[in-house]
């Protein structure tokens, strides 16, 4: 599955048994918009609400830390996703939050995941169908994944500060750094 799919591709695929569409919209805390209310008011037909703001490691002292493998598997199970599912993520956010969701899926080895090119804004601009309310979900059992090689924990990063064995790049903008 390509990492980026078009609105036309998604429109043609809607209704496929193995396709799960997730609204991954999230706004920064200083933004007054309510992503959950926006989803409830208008979303791609059949899309489920990911709630990316809570798709984090709830036990970590680090804000917005990547969810644990257990939390990842639990959330995917609640969303009715199986290892055979194809997942398309989209957002309607200035921070392009679908990209964070895509990263988390890929981090845990979920390969059949893509981002909708242009997000909900493009979908709406093309006059495509929208739905309101919550999409009913039949939960599934999602197996516990493992993290992909190449990821580092906070402890790994702190140890590297002394060892300087690896180059670390912080991609946040200056205001968040």
Where are these regions (language model features)?
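Cytosolic catalytic domains that perform sulfur/thiol-centered chemistry
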Residues: 1-177
